[in-house]
Amino acid sequence: MRHLVLDTETTGLSAAEGHRIIEIGVIEMVNFSVTDRSLHLYINPERDIDVGAQDIHGLSSEFLADKPVFADILTEFTDFIKDDLLVIHNAPFDIGFLNAEFSRCGHPPLSMERVIDTLPLARQKYPGAQASFCLLYTSPSPRDIS
């Protein structure tokens, strides 16, 4: 069975306020083992990045200026994820942003029925603990998904 572990970075916290996706990372797992297949995309958001968001992910408007816009990576992204199960930490956030981008491109939305959200699992396993996925990383560069 194929599962895809997915994460995004954004220009801010609210897709409803026009914030955009600036990075997508996807790692493939088959039968619960990581394979050598992954997808990593930087995206030009065509808008400024909130200072608070930039403090978290370190990506700047200058760095993203020559990257493709979301419409230009949509097919590559959807071809990679197909209809497979997505594993996402705080899934409503990422799916909300992905569906806002899909809507701008006239593409049907992703269904939460194909998503496992690890945030409720983390809260169940570690009640009262900080549930931020980024705190699980000890590597200085979480962008190395190879």
Language-model segment annotations:
Residues 126-136:
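A structural motif
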Residues 27-46:
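Short glycine-rich, Thr/Ser-proximal phosphate-binding strand/loop in the N-terminal lobe
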Residues 1-32:
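Entry/capping segment at the start of metal-dependent catalytic domains
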Residues 3-5, 38-40, 115:
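Conserved beta-strand scaffold positions in the cores of enzyme catalytic domains, especially
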Residues 48-51, 132-133:
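Short, glycine/polar-rich helix-capping loops at beta-to-alpha or helix-loop-helix junctions
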Residues 10-12, 120, 144:
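Short, glycine/acidic-enriched loop or turn micro-motifs at the edges of active sites
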Residues 137-146:
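Single conserved hydrophobic/aromatic residue that forms the stacking wall/gate
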Residues 56-128:
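Conserved DEDDh/DEDDy metal-dependent 3′-5′ exonuclease domain
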